[in-house]
A protein has these predicted regions:
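Alpha-helical scaffold segments in soluble metabolic enzymes
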Residues: 30-33, 142-149, 169, 173, ...
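Short, intrinsically disordered/low-complexity patches at protein termini
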Residues: 117, 149-151, 191-193
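N-terminal ligand-binding/catalytic initiation module
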Residues: 1-138, 142-144, 154
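Short, surface-exposed alpha-helical segments at coil->helix boundaries
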Residues: 112, 168, 193-197
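Glycine-rich adenosine-cofactor-binding loop
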Residues: 143, 154-178, 187-191
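Short acidic-hydrophobic, aromatic-tinged amphipathic segments that line or gate anion-handling sites
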Residues: 211-212
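Structural signal for hydrophobic packing residues in well-ordered secondary-structure cores
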Residues: 35-42, 147, 151, 178, ...
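NAD(P)-binding Rossmann-fold cofactor-contacting core
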Residues: 177-207
Length: 212
């Protein structure tokens, strides 16, 4: 009888950090490799055209069914985003997230993301992972790749438009590529905002060598 056990890694957010998800330099290297595979066409996304971003669960605005979920708050949705990545990876995977604007009142992120990796031949799950940090680092790594190839040589000044979470991971990606940066400038709506203060704290803690 064949072995039918299905074993996979479960990685919570701490596990992901321990595994190196916050290693911005490695994220930039990986995304550079992924973009090369994309350019070669060694990828698949959803749909017949193989380029669908994903499929979204859309809630109705009203329902006669008691307790039925409704589109009654900002950004309320579920989204499934399957893909195949070739090259040395040769894996199928999916990012799945649920989002609800009311989450903030509960002390939760607006969107909560998970990622699954599967054997592309058998469909066996290989890993089920917390993906909020993973997705954020991926987002920041892409402009990191662009800056790596298109920036002036040995840049001294980095300017960020906005102090939010995405620009925090962009900052990490840029700093992983350029140890010449000694000044960080940020343009935001208010220097007194919570996000601006958090960015200031982050820069002082992680990059004490720069002025801002």
């Amino acid at each position: 009888m064949s072995d039918t056990r299905i074993d996979f890694l479960y990685l919570n957010e701490k596990d992901m950090i321990d595994a190196g998800v916050l290693d911005a330099g490695h994220c930039v290297e990986t995304m550079e490799e992924v973009l090369c595979l994309l350019a070669k066409g060694d990828v698949l996304m959803g749909g017949k055209n193989r380029r669908e971003h994903g499929i979204q669960l859309i809630f109705p605005k009203e329902s006669e069914i008691p307790g039925f979920p409704l589109e009654d708050s900002r950004d309320r949705r579920f989204m499934s985003m399957p893909a195949y990545l070739g090259g040395r990876f040769h894996l199928a995977g999916e990012k799945f997230y649920g989002s609800n604007g009311r989450n903030v009142r509960k002390g939760l992120p607006r969107s909560i993301l998970m990622a699954t990796l599967n054997n592309v031949e058998t469909g066996q799950p290989l890993a089920y992972m917390s993906a909020n940090l993973l997705s954020a680092m991926r987002t920041g790594a892409v402009p990191g790749v662009v800056a790596k190839h298109l920036s002036v040589k040995n840049p001294k000044v980095l300017t960020l438009l906005g102090p939010g979470v995405v620009n925090k991971t962009c900052l990490m990606a840029y700093m992983s590529q350029f140890n010449s940066i000694d000044t960080i400038k940020i343009k935001g709506s208010s220097a007194a905002s919570a996000t601006a203060k958090e960015m200031e704290r982050f820069i002082k803690e992680k990059y004490p060598q720069v002025s801002h």
